[in-house]
Every structure is written in structure tokens, then in C-alpha cells.
A protein has these predicted regions:
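Active-site glycine/GP-rich loop and adjacent strand/helix microenvironment
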Residues: 1-143
Length: 143
């Protein structure tokens, strides 16, 4: 949420108590991959993000055998509504980045009807946050 993960209770407090009249715009991504936007505000205070356009692909892969990047893990995509490690792929003519394993975990979600109306047909991610074993060594925030 603006560069850091946020829990449902904190998000609810931000939207309803701290900043009830503000327009909340949330995004998820990084400088290399680009930005996935929150298309719909969730009544359950989930943060659902979808990549814009076919050149950006998000996968969520199993973490059963750890989170070390490997080509065999790329084929182990979790089912919808299951959590795993986020992997980005950016497929531009000028910027080709396949198989970028992130230090984040998230829930894999199918495109919503609103996302499809905007032409977004790729999977998205829900409630991204740091992988458990990354919390000890990773600084969070905007940098």
C-alpha cells in the first residue's frame, strides 16, 4: 500500500477513520517490472492487484520446497485462492525480464469482471507481503 504491505485492519482504519474523504490509490510492483493497480476496492479490505497489459505477467508459485529461484518451481503455479511466492515476467521489446522471483508472497486470483472490462485478462495477486523467511534481512518501505 504505497510501497509497503498493510493488513486489513490498518487499511480499514486508513479508509474509514484516518482519511475517510481521501481517494485511495494502491499499487504493487517494482521499478523493473512496473505497477499492478488495484482495480476495485474490496468490501473485505483485501488488496487485489492486476498487471496492465499482456507484456506484464504475474505468477504465484508454490513454496513447499523453499523460495530459492529455480526453473522447476515455475511450473508449480498454485491454484486460485492459494498463496505462494510472486514471480514477475516483463516481455517488452526494449525490456525483457523473465522469471523474476520476488521476495513476496501473495494469493493468486483470477481477473475480476471489472478487470476484464478494462481488458485485463491475466491473473492477479491478493494481499502481497514479505515471505516469512525474508523478514529478517529485508528493509521495507519506499526507496
Amino acid at each position: 500500500y504505497g510501497g509497503i504491505s498493510i493488513g486489513k485492519e490498518a487499511l480499514k482504519r486508513f479508509k474509514e477513520e484516518n482519511f475517510p474523504n481521501a481517494v485511495h490509490i494502491s499499487g504493487y510492483g517494482n521499478t523493473l517490472f512496473g505497477l499492478c493497480l488495484e482495480i476495485d476496492a474490496s468490501p473485505a479490505y483485501d488488496l487485489d492487484y492486476f498487471p496492465l497489459g499482456p507484456r506484464m505477467i504475474v505468477q504465484v508459485v508454490e513454496t513447499d520446497n523453499g523460495n530459492v529461484p529455480s526453473s522447476e518451481r515455475l511450473s508449480k503455479v498454485v491454484n486460485y485462492e492459494e498463496e505462494g511466492q510472486v514471480v514477475f515476467h516483463r516481455l517488452d521489446e526494449s525490456f525483457f525480464i523473465p522469471n523474476m522471483f520476488e521476495r513476496d508472497r501473495a494469493v493468486r486470483i483470477p481477473p475480476t469482471s471489472t478487470a476484464i472490462e478494462y481488458g485485463i485478462t491475466q491473473d492477479g495477486v491478493r494481499n502481497p507481503s514479505l515471505l516469512e523467511n525474508s523478514k529478517q534481512v529485508v528493509k521495507t518501505g519506499l526507496y
